[in-house]
Amino acid sequence: MEKYVKFLKIFIISFFIILSIYFIITYTNKHEYYLNRLIFKTSRIVSVDSPLRGQIFDKNGVLLVGNKKIYNLAYHIKNNENLDDVVKSALKIFPELDSAQVYESLNKGYLYEDKIIKKNLTNEEVEKVLSSNPNDFFIKETYERFYQFGLTLKNIFGSVSKISKENKSYYLENGYSIWDSVGISGLEKEYEEYLKGVKAKYKVNSDNTLSLISPPKNGSDLYLSIDINLVNKVNDIIKEELINAKKKPNTEYLNDTYVIISKPKTGEIISINGQRYLNDDYFTDISFNNITSSFTMGSVVKGATISVGYKYDLIDYNKKVLDGCVKLANLTEKCSFQRLGYLDDIKALEMSSNYYQFLIAISLAGKKYIPNMKLEVSNNEFDIYRNMLASYGLGIITGIDLPNEKIGLIGKKVSPDLLLNLAIGQYDTYTPIELLNYINTLASKGEKRSPSLVYQIKNYGNVIYQNNYEIKENVDLSKEYYDRIFKGFYNVMNYGTGKGYMNYNLNPAGKTGTSESFLDTDNDGKIDTKTLSLTMAGFFPVENPEYSLVVVSPNASHNNSKKEYIYYITNRVSRKITDYFNSLNVKSLEK
């Protein structure tokens, strides 16, 4: 009998020990779950009236921007209620609250609206409110945005904030409350109408209580063409090369590099990157500058400028010319970077002859080049060039689905020297997104589409928007000329000035550029330093382009006529990116 009693005692003690351990583990692992259940069970003190804002996903369904639940202490004021009593009750729950701030919270907004007394409660504070069972105080759930990949592309995704004073009238007229949060930048602003959802509708009763008429409807989800894994890979490449560059001479002004990768047949952007070097350990994401910051792009735009020669029958491609320099009256001579021998149009692209482009510009002005000649030009010649450049997407708004896109600077002065500069990409400035639009249009043989980030929008799983990638314009140029540009660009990347910039296995085509740029290094409003900026734009494979790539590195070196060392960061970045693409192709073939 004693053995039985002893066994029973041991069994009971063991049972309660195991049960205690189980409850401890359950509480630890499922604390938030049971907290939510507790709130649900005590629903009389819970109010959820705002719709969930739509989320943002990448092309593979990876969550990029989501919603994080926030618990708040709230109160709903009754008619003729003494606010002093409400403040005292609030201080009983949280003595650390400032009474003046509680009064301010109670007096915000309309009388029938819930008043937020304390924001962002911890789980412990929520339990404290629920266990104290305060009269008429309740837990109000709200949500704030969270970014799955930190600051990566955050300026592209945009921000959500309260309505600003200057936009107050617009939003109030469109059904918003003054206290609502709205998208104020990036995709959040561009697609506000889809992301915001529909608020719950209530009837305000005579006693200031609310009766639900219709529940809230969550916002729609954006699905981007972006591949976040590729974005992260490209960021790593840019950072690595900026660190390497800063160890080399003449790179004190090199801090930024931009990359955009897309599908030229649709304009879908699969990676958009911008990194600014602060030191070897710290960088800042400046991806949005791809659509707002402009630079002289240099020879990379010669696919568009040589099109002027084709369209206006200024090129006899059965005839070769001897590369040299152009010397106009009273002006310094202008040359290619070296003497390049005899050239036709394809060889001129391959070796990036400035002289060949100068001859086209002079012919456009109705003259044949003679050394020391006087050349008269008008707005007409500049307009012809700029209209051709614009037909490719340079010097105009591209229409990318982001707010506040800016175009580069369009020069206002008209002179023979500047016309020659315009012909080689050394006058007007363009943004990286304009450069992408140009190379995509070229790769599509004249079909211009707007670059885009969102390919689909879903609401509760149903597709409510599908990007159809409309052709916005066709460049007025025949197929035979595109074939010649393609041949020239193919030669650039395989035999010419761009040799080694892109992995040969991808069968690439493209163009490089080096341009003069200028800096105000002491911020006194005056240009004091000349630099060189480096660019490249290409696509692959040449026979049926699937991908396009642009790389822009402003102020990469001193403007020293290439007599000193230049770290060609665009070469290294574009090569590593295309090596990565080649490795993906090899892996897919192995599978």
Label the model's feature ranges.
Residues 1-282, 389, 521-523, 559-591:
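Periplasmic/cell-envelope proteins involved in peptidoglycan metabolism and beta-lactam response
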Residues 63-65, 201-213, 226, 251-298, ...:
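Beta-lactam-recognizing serine transpeptidase/beta-lactamase-like catalytic domain environment
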Residues 50, 118, 298-299, 378:
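Charged, low-complexity surface patches
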